[in-house]
Amino acid sequence: NDIDDELTKQFAAVCYQWEEDTRWIIFRGTDESLTGWKEDFMMTYSDLIPAQTDAIEYLRKQAATFSGMLNVSGHSKGGNLSLYASAMQEEAVQNRIQQIYCWDAPGVHRSILSTKGYQRVVSKAKRYIPQDSIVGLMLESQVPYHIIESQGSGISQHSALMWNIEEDHFIELKELTKNSQLTDQTFKQWTEVVSDEDLKLFFDTFFELFFEMGVETVNDVYYNFRMYMQKFFEKAYQMDTEKREILLRVGRLLFQIRYEIWRDTLSVSVEIPTLTLPSVEELVESWTGEHRISVTYESTEENEEIRHYYQDRQKQKKLEMKQAKHPK
């Protein structure tokens, strides 16, 4: 398992000799390291992350030492690496790839979809996601998915141990849960509205705070959630103005989009209140009391213009989605 904090990389792979003329190349998904999780979110704004570079080279080397057929597979980020690495091989290697399995794996950056390499292998890919999938619907994909009946809900279904099996096959369903569909719409609209540059700054800032606290794994946060959240906000308010503003603005936009998508799906004939999110200076009020922090924040005219710009882009995207769903 190759973890490089400087490069923001977490990568692992293994090769199995399945039959005399067939090999399986398996890419590991994200482990519990914070570096690995940060690298995952880099895929929202970058068309190439360090683990993908390693995956391309690993698959190339395995193909060079073996003349038979290849199958490529992976769970979560490993599934992304499987498809991405296959798409970036020479055509001669791609012709030897029989199947690509993506198990609840995020898609790819939108810039990859139109490449010749991706188009040559996409028909060989199989995609499986649980009924309440979150990770498996992230980013873009042209691979149809199979929905697996699963236990638990939300992110807990990401573990394949939660997927239901009957005899020698997965139990398949016809539809995703409503929560999965809404989360998918939210994340895709959010990453479409926010520029790649702002997404990079947002995630760099978000993870920087946890690294400064000495967090090494997501389990550190999970088992000490309350303590780390308090430290997170303390450090956030001590950051320079630009970083603090991007963290609040882009994060707030995510929640606003989620709320509005949920509101638009309601079929009941009751009046639903409009969510009006506060401006930055209203959002960050002074906290008082034991174990609390006191902060002040002044929003500049430029920051407010940027905030309104993103709100306008979101409204335009929402209108385009409605028009596409209900053409005249």
Segments (PLM) and residue ranges:
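Alpha/beta hydrolase fold serine-hydrolase catalytic domain that processes acyl esters and thioesters
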Residues: 1-23, 27-69, 90-328
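Gly/Ala-rich beta-loop-alpha elbow adjacent to hydrolase catalytic centers
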Residues: 74-78, 82
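Short glycine-enriched nucleophile-adjacent loop
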Residues: 82-91
